[in-house]
Amino acid sequence: PAVMATRALENQRDRLKTILITPFMSCSARLTIYVLLADMFFPKSAMLVAYSLYLVGVAMAILIALIVHRMTDNKTENALLIELPEYKIPNLRTVAIYVWEKIKDYLTKAGTTIFLASIILWFVMNVGPAGFISDVADSFAAKFGQILVPVLKPVGLGSWQIAVALISGISAKEVVVSSMSVLYGIGNINSAAGMAELSGILGGTGFTSVNAYALMVFCLLYTPCIATIATIKRETQSWRWTLGMVMFQLVLAWSAAFLVFQIGSRLF
């Protein structure tokens, strides 16, 4: 909805700038990641840590907006004037038709992209070189996750399980938590015992509070979910712009997590 709301901006350049920074605002799906990791690794200040991620997102959006503003030609200024109509009781039939048209438009355009991407993600998570698998460790996703380990190691996320969880998070950010639960063999991540077990497993691999915060920062800034990507494609009418945004967010997420991990490791 936030991306689609940019239609109210008359200038195409302003729309693209707004679409670029909108994904940096934390959604409710990311909150599940913050709550889980903050509660496990920052038990005394979990709420402050979770709130800090929201502030990081806002600060990053402002910074990127300022940089883009200075890099582009801004000679033309547009005053956003919206004529407010007279308030009236809406006609239910008119509202129903309007809502149906929007839903149909979304399902036929953005929904198609979401469906295809979901099939691809399901395939790589459930199929491996030997065919259909019962253990995710044998899947194509796990193989790809192992390839990503050297890339993610400098940011403190050097395990294939975390890499696969991040890949699955492209479908929906809350899936990162459930994927980590499955990949690390946790029965019920929503219980105190499950969280303690996952914390113990991660701690045994050298995963500290610094790694946890780096992971939260990465989840905040990296590629948004499929639905958002599809909506961006629909609003910009450009795969080049959409894929460019995805790559930019990946690089930004890696860079920010790198700074957090490297600086944090030296200070704590």
Report residues per predicted region:
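Extended, low-charge hydrophobic alpha-helical regions
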Residues: A2-L16, I119-L250
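Long hydrophobic segments that form regular secondary structure
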Residues: L48, N74-E77, Y87-F132, S139, ...
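Transmembrane helix-loop junctions at the membrane interface of multipass transporters and ion channels
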Residues: F24, S28-Y51, A227-S238, L259-F268
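Membrane-embedded alpha-helical segments of transport systems
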Residues: P1, L20-V35, S52-A61, S171-V177, ...
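Hydrophobic core segments of alpha-helical transmembrane domains in multi-pass membrane transport
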Residues: A38-M40, Y54-V68, I114-N126, M216-Y222, ...
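Juxtamembrane/interface segments at transmembrane-helix termini
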Residues: A65-A79, P129-D135, S265-F268
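Juxtamembrane inter-helical linkers in multi-pass membrane proteins
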Residues: P1, N74-Y98, A141-K143, Y184-E197
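Small-residue-enriched core segments of transmembrane alpha-helices in multipass membrane transport
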Residues: P23-S26, F41-F42, L48-I64, D135-K153, ...
